[in-house]
Amino acid sequence: MRLNTLSPAEGAKHSAKRLGRGIGSGLGKTGGRGHKGQKSRTGGGVRRGFEGGQMPLYRRLPKFGFTSMKAAVTAEVRLNDLAKVEGGVVTLESLKAANVITKDIQFVKIILAGEVKGAVVVRGLRVTKGAKAAIEAAGGSVEE
C-alpha cells in the first residue's frame, strides 16, 4: 500500500447534485423546486412553526408550569463519593471541601449507588432509605 494508491471505498463518496445544468441532468430548469410558489423562489420559505397565517399551535395552547430554580442548586451524591471526605463526618461543607460538589450547591441527597468504604457520620443531609441502611450496615450513622 502506498499513499498515491489510496482511494475511498466504492460507494463511500457521492457526487454533488448540480442543479440547473440542463434538461439531460434531470435537475435542469426548476432544479427540483417544482413550479412557482413561495418555496420555488430564492430566499423562499417560512419560519419554524408558521402555519400560513393561522394561529400556530404554540400560541393556541396555554402556558403551563415553571422551572424550579431549586433544581440548579441541588445535587445527588453517591455512597462511594463519601470516601473522598476526610474525617469521617459528612456535611454540606465537607463535601464542598472534598470537591464532591460545587460551591453553589445548597441541597444534597445521598443515594444508594456504589458502596460505603468504612463508617461515616452523615449530618444535616437528606438520605434515601437504601443509602441509610447501607451506611448503618457499614457501622456509620445518619444524624438529622
Curated annotation (Swiss-Prot):
Mind telling me which SUPFAM superfamilies this protein's record contains?
Ribosomal proteins L15p and L18e (SSF52080)
Instruction: Enumerate the UniProt keywords alphabetically.
Output: Ribonucleoprotein, Ribosomal protein, RNA-binding, rRNA-binding
User: Annotated region Disordered: where?
Assistant: 1-53
Q: What is any one of the record's Gene Ontology cellular component terms?
A: cytosolic large ribosomal subunit
Q: Identify the domain of life.
A: Bacteria
Q: Name one Pfam family in it.
A: Ribosomal_L27A
Q: Quote the biased-composition stretches of kind Gly residues, using this chain's numbering.
A: 21-31
Q: Which GO terms describe its biological process?
A: translation
Task: Please name the InterPro entries in this protein's record.
Answer: Ribosomal_uL15, Ribosomal_uL15/eL18, Ribosomal_uL15/eL18_sf, Ribosomal_uL15_bac-type, Ribosomal_uL15_CS
Gene3D superfamilies attached to this UniProt entry: 3.100.10.10
**Can you provide one Gene Ontology molecular function annotated for this UniProt record?**
rRNA binding
Keyword hit for Ribonucleoprotein: yes
Q: Which PANTHER family match?
A: 50S RIBOSOMAL PROTEIN L15 (PTHR12934), LARGE RIBOSOMAL SUBUNIT PROTEIN UL15M (PTHR12934:SF11)
| Quaternary context | Part of the 50S ribosomal subunit.
Q: What is the protein's known function?
A: Binds to the 23S rRNA.
Q: Which family does it belong to?
A: Belongs to the universal ribosomal protein uL15 family.
Family annotation (HAMAP family):
Ribosomal_uL15
**The protein's name:** Large ribosomal subunit protein uL15
Origin organism is: Pasteurella multocida (strain Pm70)
- What taxonomic lineage is listed for the species of origin? Bacteria, Pseudomonadati, Pseudomonadota, Gammaproteobacteria, Pasteurellales
